[in-house]
């Protein structure tokens, strides 16, 4: 029930008939005036009228329809006022719990892949934006009526997993410590193993360097030793056991390479071992993500792509391509020459962008991750019979994602290439928290969530709030902080500020909903359209009604354009105006029953819009805070 859409259509039909132009052309040019006093809808006439505007504008002076109250020409603009009474009746005579969540006419089958963290340590601050963006996109697309499949790509064949398994092997393949979260336990072993290997490697390099190179490497070694000492302080016995075992080995890197090779070949013994420890990591991930109410439909293992020969089939096809070239001693694809202007346009690749050669294999014959991504993309499209695949991946993967689309085009998967979308996002920083060191200290999502929980708990204690809501409020704070900013912009926020109950936060939207719900819960009246005083539909009440009317359009555009920040901004604006109004005018205490009835309807509309908007974002609306 898109009331604003109907009003725009009504205006477009009239203007098109008067000017003798297409209704579609008029409709797409209808905008909102910058100031309320100018009107509710606006048209820039030069975009529609060629020649003498004033002469043609005379045809547009008089009009009154069902949803359009009146129109007027001001200079080069045609401005229209909505019929508030009819807008009100149209909305509230049919208002239900699904209001605004407009279903798309032709739903698609869409895969959303997000998070896909390496299963070697807990999810950390670097994954936070990815996982919330991905989950919210999936929820929004489902709410729009699409069939959505949410997937997690388990990268279990790379060097990082092999380093973890090597460390576990040296420790005798132990079981996780009983009082430590499993992914955290694995992360400590991985970090210890990795830093010990790095220190050993650097010390070997120092023996072969010139004096200037030596000084630079010594500084790097000093940094590693600081990290190693910090890790040792966390568990001296574990660290020393690993250090002694690694330093006693002649060629640890060769042994790690053998782990990679054997696992890729499908060695049965190694498969059982690695899958066991990977399951521990995924168990930890699921525990963390459950706090944010995030679930996946499928976990896809990279190793399965290798064992089922999907990667080899892709590699064979790429190696037989005419775009194959030698490049720095290895084999690569010259996608830059292969992709012409038409293909670049179709695949959303900037015309002048120089695409680096796509390296297919290392010098040792092993494939690179982009080749595996090609196989995985084909798998995702085919396995779900998908119309679109959305990869939620950081902006640093911009070029690899372009190479991926180019390679799919080269292989003849033109539809897949065109309908593979890279949902890119910038870095996130939480003020006062720092990732320190590439080998040791990470800030986990669990730690962030615990800090948020404590902040929310203290604020609720101060306010005498409902302590049962702590997790829901913490979740709302995180989701709002991330979803309120355009994904391609860098993001920085403060945990204290994002838990504010007063303004511009997830808890603030929840508080606004609870405020509206409380008013409705206290009312003993049944809503009746016959008892409404429409003359009271002025000021903030008028503005709130128009926002309620706009919600279906805002929802549709936000989801269709994958711009959830627009939905967040809308909900914030609605909350601001509602709270401003309620602080000035009473609802239940209003003595005039007809004015009171109108105000109850307005409160009801706000509560439905907030509840539905929050649900799309994955935020729970709370009846009491």
Swiss-Prot record:
Principal subcellular localization: cytoplasm
Cellular location(s): Cytoplasm
GO molecular function: arginine-tRNA ligase activity; ATP binding
EC number per UniProt: 6.1.1.19
Keyword Electron transport among UniProt keywords: no
Motif extent ('HIGH' region): 117-127
PANTHER family: ARGININE--TRNA LIGASE, CYTOPLASMIC (PTHR11956:SF5), ARGINYL-TRNA SYNTHETASE (PTHR11956)
GO cellular component assignments: cytoplasm
Family: Belongs to the class-I aminoacyl-tRNA synthetase family.
Keywords carried by this UniProt record: Aminoacyl-tRNA synthetase, ATP-binding, Cytoplasm, Ligase, Nucleotide-binding, Protein biosynthesis
UniProt xrefs under InterPro entries: Arg-tRNA-ligase, Arg-tRNA-synth_N, Arg-tRNA-synth_N_sf, ArgRS_core, DALR_anticod-bd, Rossmann-like_a/b/a_fold, tRNAsynth_Ia_anticodon-bd
Coiled coil spans: none
Chemical reaction(s) catalysed: tRNA(Arg) + L-arginine + ATP = L-arginyl-tRNA(Arg) + AMP + diphosphate
This protein's name: Arginine--tRNA ligase
SMART domains in the record: Arg_tRNA_synt_N, DALR_1
Pfam families recorded: DALR_1 (PF05746), tRNA-synt_1d (PF00750)
GO terms, biological process: arginyl-tRNA aminoacylation
